[in-house]
């Protein structure tokens, strides 16, 4: 029946694109056209939002949060579309139900794996917070004892982030399976069914690709990335293919080295933790060297002091012996008065001169030993203390800067992980709610069918 003259123009000014999308004579009503166009426009807009200015931004927690928000919005939209289509579950083909239930349960498994990994990384924050708490000091510079207490926590945290999560490794095979099963199912005798399958193909393609990015980034491996190319007949194909090309090339390049910690916020904290570990070890070695030098200097002083005391005792002994000899000579000279007073006085003068000479010699030697001690002490101080003080001061400044950087990076990582974990949990609930709603409607439909059979 031909269209009457003056009737309204077509909704599409350059022809109906859905004739290409739905070959075989399937015609969409204006309502269905508007529903599908609105859904696919929103899908294309979300994909354009996900395309970062720099491809490396997909390695950040902030981009991952944006991606989960987009997925949540798209899955909410598909639920609304199913409602607006007014397509009861009783009219669904068994294959449609199987596709939806199979893909949704695998998607839930992936969400659980992602949540588990984020939770594991978040628990590691306790180790970082403890280490930073131990390193905190009113004077600013942590002591050697504080460094020793913090070192095991830093080492344990680095070991934790260096381990690949087994659940994420298993997700790679699941994602590849989902990507391999993606196809636009042929639907006969149901225009609404064709719209539904087209919408499901779009959301599954985007979900699988985004989830593969998450798994690749968190596992530090490009293997989970799926290879997809959406045909041009889909209105959102250009946005999807542009995002896929940019992100896949960048991730493959970034993850080629096999680094486990691929998230930028995580890498920043790890770099600070490694540097802090090195500085703590260096500071410990420097302090041990300084203590050893001080011990050697103290030992030398004690040995020198003991030597001087022993030499002084020896000289005093000589002096005492000489005085005793002199007294004996005086007694003998006095007892032999018959030999002459002049000879006795000569002996007395000679003995006195010997005593004076001995005292002068001892005084001179002690003065020389004192000069040697002062010279050695000054040389040791200039050789050990001054250079060490400069080296230790530089190490302490670098240590404080590293602690400050790690504190800021750890705080950013904590907020990022908490926010992303919450969003992944919300997305899990959206998928689970949609799946439960379908199962509930199936049970109601089956019950109604059985009642109808009994009634008939």
UniProtKB/Swiss-Prot annotation:
Signal peptide: none annotated. GO terms for cellular component: membrane. It is found in: Membrane. Keywords: Membrane, Transmembrane, Transmembrane helix. PANTHER family: BPS1-LIKE PROTEIN (PTHR31509). Belongs to the ROH1 family. This is UPF0496 protein 4. It comes from Oryza sativa subsp. indica (Rice). The lineage of its organism: Eukaryota, Viridiplantae, Streptophyta, Embryophyta, Tracheophyta.
């Amino acid at each position: 029946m031909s269209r009457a003259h003056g009737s309204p123009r077509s909704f599409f000014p350059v022809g109906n694109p859905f004739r290409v999308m739905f070959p075989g004579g399937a015609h969409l009503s204006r309502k269905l056209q508007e529903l599908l166009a609105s859904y696919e426009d929103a899908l294309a807009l979300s994909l354009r939002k996900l395309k970062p200015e720099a491809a490396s931004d997909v390695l950040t927690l902030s981009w991952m949060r944006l991606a989960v928000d987009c997925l949540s919005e798209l899955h909410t939209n598909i639920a609304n579309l199913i409602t607006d289509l007014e397509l009861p579950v009783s009219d669904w083909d068994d294959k449609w139900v199987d596709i939806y239930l199979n893909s949704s349960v695998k998607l839930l498994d992936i969400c659980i794996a992602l949540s588990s990994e984020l939770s594991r990384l978040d628990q590691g924050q306790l180790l970082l917070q403890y280490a930073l708490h131990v390193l905190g000091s009113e004077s600013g510079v942590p002591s050697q004892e504080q460094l020793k207490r913090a070192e095991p926590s830093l080492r344990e945290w680095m070991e934790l982030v260096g381990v690949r999560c087994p659940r994420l490794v298993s997700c790679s095979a699941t994602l590849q399976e989902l990507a391999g099963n993606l196809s636009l199912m042929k639907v006969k005798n149901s225009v609404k069914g064709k719209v539904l399958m087209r919408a499901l193909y779009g959301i599954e393609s985007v979900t699988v690709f985004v989830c593969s990015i998450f798994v690749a980034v968190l596992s530090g491996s490009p293997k989970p990335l799926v290879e997809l190319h959406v045909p041009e007949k889909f209105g959102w194909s250009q946005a999807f293919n542009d995002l896929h090309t940019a992100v896949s090339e960048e991730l493959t390049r970034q993850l080629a080295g096999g680094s486990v910690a691929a998230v930028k916020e995580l890498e920043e904290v790890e770099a600070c933790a490694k540097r802090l570990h090195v500085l703590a070890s260096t500071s410990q070695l420097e302090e041990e060297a300084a203590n050893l030098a001080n011990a050697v200097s103290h030992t030398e002083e004690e040995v020198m002091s003991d030597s001087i005391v022993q030499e002084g005792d020896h000289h005093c002994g000589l002096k005492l012996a000489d005085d005793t000899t002199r007294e004996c000579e005086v007694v003998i000279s006095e007892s032999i008065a018959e030999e002459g007073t002049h000879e006795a006085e000569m002996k007395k003068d000679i003995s006195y001169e010997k005593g004076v000479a001995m005292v002068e010699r001892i005084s001179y030697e002690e003065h020389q030993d004192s000069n040697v001690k002062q010279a050695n002490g000054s040389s040791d101080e200039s050789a050990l203390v001054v250079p060490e003080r400069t080296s230790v001061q530089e190490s302490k400044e670098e240590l404080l800067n590293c602690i400050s950087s790690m504190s800021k990076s750890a705080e950013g990582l904590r907020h990022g992980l908490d926010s992303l974990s919450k969003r992944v949990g919300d997305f899990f609930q959206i998928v689970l709610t949609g799946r439960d709603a379908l199962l509930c409607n199936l049970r109601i439909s089956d019950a109604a069918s059985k009642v109808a059979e009994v009634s008939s």
